[in-house]
């Protein structure tokens, strides 16, 4: 998992260094707990910061964008086991994975920034555009639609759906099918394929 979530499903990701440097790890599966996969950044905390500390808020956004970019180009097969709600940065986190498996009986996938009055940072727009079709990206971003599992599957936002008890199992099974691929070739292919998006995400620029 990417760290323990709080009661609202917000989580602080652990560094990917540990995974990447462990040669025994051949694939990566992420998941959440209970009804949340991830709700992304802690907007309440960010909004509560005094003016003198607002730089920390901007740095958190930059760090998140760069994390998404690192995961998008990660040198092994990655699968998101979406066990519950995936909103905002949490939804973008799922897009950084190679494959997504979503729980059928609970949870929505959503980019709610339009309802929050929040602009997309260039790197956030880049990952959405890189991983979704133009039509689906437009619908998700401009309408803020909440996609249930079957709807997300029909739109190719996710690659598979499964009941709660089988989400992680199916995600691991998918990871196993690709685990034999060499890290160097997988990483290079991802970097080549997503180079334009990765370049934007590496900058970590804030919304204009």
Where would I find each of the regions flagged by the language model?
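Hydrophobic/aromatic residues within transmembrane alpha-helices
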Residues: 30, 42, 93-94, 152, ...
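Acidic, divalent-metal-coordinating active-site segment for phosphoryl/phosphodiester hydrolysis
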Residues: 88, 144-151
């Amino acid at each position: 998992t990417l760290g323990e979530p709080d009661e609202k499903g917000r989580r602080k990701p652990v560094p990917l260094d540990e995974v990447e440097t462990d040669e025994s790890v051949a694939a990566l599966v992420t998941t959440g707990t209970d009804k949340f996969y991830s709700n992304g950044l802690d907007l309440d905390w960010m909004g509560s910061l005094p003016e003198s500390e607002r730089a920390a808020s901007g740095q958190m956004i930059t760090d998140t964008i760069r994390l998404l970019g690192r995961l998008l180009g990660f040198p092994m097969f990655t699968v998101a086991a979406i066990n519950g709600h995936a909103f905002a940065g949490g939804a973008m986190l799922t897009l950084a994975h190679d494959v997504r498996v979503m729980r059928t009986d609970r949870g929505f996938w959503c980019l709610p920034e339009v309802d929050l009055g929040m602009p997309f940072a260039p790197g956030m727009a880049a990952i959405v555009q890189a991983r979704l079709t133009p039509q689906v990206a437009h619908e998700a971003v401009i309408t803020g639609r909440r996609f249930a599992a079957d709807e997300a599957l029909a739109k190719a936002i996710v690659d598979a759906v499964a009941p709660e008890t089988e989400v992680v199992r199916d995600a691991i099974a998918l990871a196993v099918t690709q685990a034999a691929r060499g890290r160097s070739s997988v990483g290079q292919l991802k970097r080549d394929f997503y180079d334009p998006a990765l370049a934007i995400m590496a900058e970590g620029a804030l919304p204009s």
